[in-house]
Amino acid sequence: MQLEKMITEGSNAASAEIDRVSTLEMCRIINDEDKTVPLAVERVLPDIAAAIDVIHTQVSGGGRLIYLGAGTSGRLGILDASECPPTYGVKPGLVVGLIAGGEYAIQHAVEGAEDSREGGVNDLKNIGLTAQDVVVGIAASGRTPYVIAGLEYARQLGCRTVGISCNPGSAVSTTAEFAITPVVGAEVVTGSSRMKAGTAQKLVLNMLSTGLMIKSGKVFGNLMVDVVATNEKLHVRQVNIVKNATGCSAEQAEAALVACERNCKTAIVMVLKNLDAAEAKKRLDQHGGFIRQVLDKE
């Protein structure tokens, strides 16, 4: 796909004279364009749901969720991956973010990195990619060689693959097994895909990882019941989670958390089923860590 024909490279009539308006009007123009992004994501919800189901199947079987991108797309993948361990208590290697140019590229532009097909393949090889893993290639344009080559390599290994881009029919979309293509239109600043396209990608990644965690039993109701208390704020959140899930007092919640080494799931089962920590943990283990199953089946 030629660059000049890409939707993400088009000129936006709404912002054609944005350099001549007041600061407030400038903000209104950007905000009006941003409002269109959730609607673009809404149109591809069935594609997102299909990807979540595949990711959950693979991860449940021992695989990993791997994000692969360059520039803004790569940084968004790293952001999403890095939030999964503290939020959901998963091991750091379960959700992985890879960026063209490596760690240095998280804060700096690395010239030519996104054009390296070899880089995309080597980065996946370096993390020991297996057929059980799912590779999600992220590229607003859908033409990034680093991402395309990585997806091709992943498919050769037998991995399930997902391509996220904002240009219909792009190479990323056609290379991946599952395509997620929120079409957000031309950017306020022509070609600045960190804006609407980046926002759309962030919304999609939020759904992919959150959907995976919900289906994996990491959420009870709407509570993050595997949250790791790494600071005072999260200690308080743990108490509130146990309170909200059980209706007990803050003192009861704290006592249960202390008794089970601050595991919200165990504390919730302890309170609701009137069990000690060891028995509550045993029952959770018997039901794969799903609180709902412990409560419904016993």
Swiss-Prot record:
Q: Could you state one GO biological process linked to this protein?
A: peptidoglycan turnover
Q: Where is the active site?
A: 83 (proton donor), 114
Which residue windows are transmembrane per the record? none
Q: Name the catalysed reactions.
A: N-acetyl-D-muramate 6-phosphate + H2O = N-acetyl-D-glucosamine 6-phosphate + (R)-lactate
Which keywords does the record carry? Carbohydrate metabolism, Lyase
What pathway does this protein act in?
A: Amino-sugar metabolism; 1,6-anhydro-N-acetylmuramate degradation; Amino-sugar metabolism; N-acetylmuramate degradation; Cell wall biogenesis; peptidoglycan recycling
Domain spans labelled SIS: 55-218
Q: Which Gene3D superfamilies match?
A: 1.10.8.1080, Glucose-6-phosphate isomerase like protein, domain 1
Q: What is its EC number?
A: 4.2.1.126
Query: What factors induce this protein?
Result: Induced by MurNAc 6-phosphate that releases the repressor MurR from the DNA. Repressed by MurR in the absence of MurNAc 6-phosphate.
Pfam families tied to this protein = GKRP-like_C, GKRP_SIS_N
**What InterPro entries does the record tag this protein with?**
Etherase_MurQ, Glucokinase_regulatory_CS, MURQ/GCKR, SIS_dom, SIS_dom_sf
Classify the source by domain of life: Bacteria
Return the broad EC class: lyase
Q: What does this protein do?
A: Specifically catalyzes the cleavage of the D-lactyl ether substituent of MurNAc 6-phosphate, producing GlcNAc 6-phosphate and D-lactate. Together with AnmK, is also required for the utilization of anhydro-N-acetylmuramic acid (anhMurNAc) either imported from the medium or derived from its own cell wall murein, and thus plays a role in cell wall recycling.
Q: How does it assemble?
A: Homodimer.
Q: Which family does it belong to?
A: Belongs to the GCKR-like family. MurNAc-6-P etherase subfamily.
Q: What protein name does the entry list?
A: N-acetylmuramic acid 6-phosphate etherase
The species is Escherichia coli O127:H6 (strain E2348/69 / EPEC)
Gene of origin? Answer: murQ
